[in-house]
């Protein structure tokens, strides 16, 4: 693994000289191996180690190099054709491979190569970009987008039209992370490497980036870039210091633990937030 990492790190430093026609075989092989690691889930762009998220930047660099190494090519689809550098993950899958993976992929979902989708996950007609990790039991609902290298935990529900930001465009240092047992409401957007910690519930139409104020109404504390575990979050506003205007903020209206979540439905958690 260290040798693979070293080859990719060196190639990335010299990426301007790399093209589909000029790249050394060593670099091609290293990038292909890295994408295979991501595809199988044996490698992740980010993982939680000793309670802290650690980003493996070399795998993200492998994803970026993949684009340097490939020309656009025709991709066959059921009703159409496409033209891109990155093939789709399931293009040549057999029934046996689908059964072994244990995930449901509903047409016309688009899942790019270099993506991992865990057992009992359901991918409705949506888009999952290269480098993403979608863990077991997660629902990616209709028209949701899972951005490049995003990390989605176990038993997460990404509701219809949700956007989870990627790292490639614009280039971000760290991936957006949704931890286990989270619910992200319809049309919400979580971007720019924000971490939504375990067991949180994000209501419909909440937008969170690194500069978004995440206000805890119980404590008065303001967070940036992180939704604390067990938070129930709705869209709101905070007044300016002079009281002349207000600006958008995400508001933590309550905290819940795993026991409460098990007893109470998501809709109940979002009711009575006044």
UniProtKB/Swiss-Prot annotation:
Pfam families (alphabetical): Hexapep_2, THDPS_N_2
Entry-linked InterPro entries: DapD_Trfase_Hexpep_rpt_fam (IPR005664), Hexapep (IPR001451), Hexapep_transf_CS (IPR018357), THP_succinylTrfase_dom1 (IPR023180), THP_succinylTrfase_N_sf (IPR037133), Trimer_LpxA-like_sf (IPR011004)
Catalytic reaction list: (S)-2,3,4,5-tetrahydrodipicolinate + succinyl-CoA + H2O = (S)-2-succinylamino-6-oxoheptanedioate + CoA
Enzyme nomenclature, EC number: 2.3.1.117
Matching CDD domains: LbH_THP_succinylT (cd03350)
Lineage top rank: taxon: Bacteria
GO BP annotations, alphabetical order: diaminopimelate biosynthetic process; lysine biosynthetic process via diaminopimelate
Primary location: cytoplasm
Protein name according to UniProt: 2,3,4,5-tetrahydropyridine-2,6-dicarboxylate N-succinyltransferase
Biological source species: Alteromonas mediterranea (strain DSM 17117 / CIP 110805 / LMG 28347 / Deep ecotype)
Name of the gene encoding the protein in the UniProt record: dapD
């Amino acid at each position: 693994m260290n040798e693979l990492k070293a080859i990719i790190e060196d190639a990335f430093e010299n990426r301007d000289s790399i093209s589909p026609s000029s790249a050394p075989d060593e670099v091609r092989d290293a990038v292909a191996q890295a994408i295979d690691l991501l595809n199988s889930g044996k490698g992740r762009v980010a993982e939680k180690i000793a309670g802290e998220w650690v980003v493996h930047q070399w795998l993200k660099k492998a994803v970026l190099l993949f684009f340097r190494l490939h020309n656009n090519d025709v991709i066959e689809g059921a009703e159409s054709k496409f033209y891109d550098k990155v093939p789709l993950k399931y293009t040549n899958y057999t029934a046996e491979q689908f059964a072994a993976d244990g995930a449901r992929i509903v047409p016309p979902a688009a899942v790019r190569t270099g993506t991992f989708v865990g057992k009992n996950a359901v991918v409705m007609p949506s888009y999952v970009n290269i480098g993403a990790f979608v863990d077991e039991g997660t629902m990616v609902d209709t028209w949701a987008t899972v951005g490049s290298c995003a990390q989605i935990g176990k038993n997460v529900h990404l509701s219809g039209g949700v956007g989870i930001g990627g790292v490639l465009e614009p280039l971000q240092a760290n991936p957006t992370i949704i931890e286990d047992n989270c619910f992200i409401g319809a049309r919400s957007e979580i971007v720019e490497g924000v971490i939504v910690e375990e067991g949180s519930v994000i209501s419909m139409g909440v937008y969170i980036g690194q500069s978004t104020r995440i206000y805890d109404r119980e404590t008065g504390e303001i967070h940036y870039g992180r939704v604390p575990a067990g938070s129930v979050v709705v869209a709101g506003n905070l007044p300016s210091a002079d009281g002349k205007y207000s600006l958008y903020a995400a508001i933590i209206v309550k905290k819940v633990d795993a026991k409460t979540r098990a007893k109470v439905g998501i809709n109940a958690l979002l009711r009575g937030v006044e």
